[in-house]
Amino acid sequence: GYGDRNFLRF
């Protein structure tokens, strides 16, 4: 999900 990608982004 978007939240997962957001976490991986940082």
Curated annotation (Swiss-Prot):
It is found in: Secreted. GO terms for cellular component: extracellular region. The keyword Secreted applies. The keyword Secreted applies. It comes from the Eukaryota. The modification Phenylalanine amide is found at residue 10. Keywords: Amidation, Neuropeptide, Secreted. GO terms for biological process: neuropeptide signaling pathway. Belongs to the FARP (FMRFamide related peptide) family. This is FMRFamide-like neuropeptide FLP7. It comes from Macrobrachium rosenbergii.
